[in-house]
Regions:
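Active-site nucleophilic cysteine motif
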Residues: 1, 5, 35-45, 50
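Secondary-structure boundary elements
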Residues: 1-34
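Short, charge-rich amphipathic segments
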Residues: 8-12, 42, 142-148
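Histidine (H) residue identity feature
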Residues: 14-15, 36, 44, 76
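Solvent-exposed, flexible loop/coil residues
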Residues: 19, 23, 28, 35-36, ...
Length: 163
């Protein structure tokens, strides 16, 4: 069931950037209604759907170099899910696949969209959060469009990472 839910969010819910959508979604219901969201919004939907079926799920964050702007650091959101049969947490990235991005449901070896490159200063926040980060949610809820969201995204980085 976990894999089916994950693949639904990854494959059937678009990443807003991949389809050029400027509307910013935040809540699971908004993402489902409009059929798209950025990584963090899609993580809200995935956690909500998993939790509906009693499957423990949390929120994870990464600090990454932008693939679109040189010297720009961006925040990336993904999930962790508890796999009861294996008694372990596994990170899942429902961002959505595209050329160069191949996130998969994999218990043995993590297959997320953006593995960190520490040489570039990228970081994983090691915490699995019970709830989405409040600053991230506030930015998603108050940004009028995706362009405005990206200009404010640094606030989420500062809240989740020391640097």
């Amino acid at each position: 069931m976990i894999k089916k839910i994950y693949e639904f969010v990854r494959d059937d819910i678009h990443h807003s950037g991949d389809i050029g959508e400027q509307r910013v979604t935040c809540t699971a219901s908004e993402v489902l209604e409009f059929g798209h969201g950025i990584c963090c919004a899609k993580s809200h939907l995935l956690a909500s759907m998993l939790r509906f079926f009693g499957i423990p799920a949390g929120f994870c964050y990464q600090k990454l170099c932008s693939s679109q702007e040189i010297n720009k650091i961006v925040l990336h959101g993904l999930n962790a899910v508890y796999i009861k049969d294996f008694e372990k947490w596994v990170r899942l990235d429902a961002r959505g696949n595209k050329p160069g991005v191949d996130a998969q449901f994999c218990i043995g070896k993590e297959k997320i969209a953006w593995p960190v490159n520490k040489k570039l200063g990228e970081e994983d926040n090691p915490i699995i959060f019970k709830e989405p980060n409040k600053t991230v949610v506030e930015i998603l809820k108050t940004s009028r469009n995706r362009k405005e969201l990206w200009m404010r995204w640094e606030l989420g980085l500062k809240d989740l990472f020391d640097s």
